[in-house]
C-alpha cells in the first residue's frame, strides 16, 4: 500500500479555517493557530446569540407595547391581562407591530382590554 503524506489534507483544512476567518483583524485572519481559535470562539458566540436573539426581540416587543399602552393610560401587565380575559389571542410580536404602525387599531385593543378588566 502506498504511503500517504498528509500535506494535502492539512493544507485543505488550513484553507477552510482561514476562509472562515476572512475579515478578522490582524493575525486572526492570517495565522492558522490564531485563526482556528477565533473561528471556534465565533461559533460559540453565534450559538449563544441565536438563543439570546429570541429573548432580546421579546424584550423589544414588550418595551414597545408597554410604551404604547402607557400612552393610552394602562400598564403593560394590565393590558395583557385584559386581552387574556377578553380572549384576544394576538402574540406580542404582532401587538408591537400594531402599536408602532397602526395606532387606531392599538387604541381599540386597549379599550377592549380595559372593558374586560
UniProtKB/Swiss-Prot annotation:
Gene Ontology terms: biological process: ribosomal large subunit assembly; translation
SUPFAM superfamilies: Ribosomal protein L20
Gene Ontology terms for molecular function: rRNA binding; structural constituent of ribosome
CC terms in the record's Gene Ontology section: ribonucleoprotein complex; ribosome
HAMAP family: Ribosomal_bL20
Protein name: Large ribosomal subunit protein bL20
Keyword RNA-binding: yes
Pfam families recorded: Ribosomal_L20
InterPro entries: Ribosomal_bL20, RIBOSOMAL_L20_CS, Ribosomal_protein_bL20_C
Function: Binds directly to 23S ribosomal RNA and is necessary for the in vitro assembly process of the 50S ribosomal subunit. It is not involved in the protein synthesizing functions of that subunit.
UniProt keyword list: Ribonucleoprotein, Ribosomal protein, RNA-binding, rRNA-binding
Family per similarity comment: Belongs to the bacterial ribosomal protein bL20 family.
Native source species: Histophilus somni (strain 2336) (Haemophilus somnus)
Listed Gene3D superfamilies: 6.10.160.10, Ribosomal protein L20
Entry annotated with the keyword RNA-binding: yes
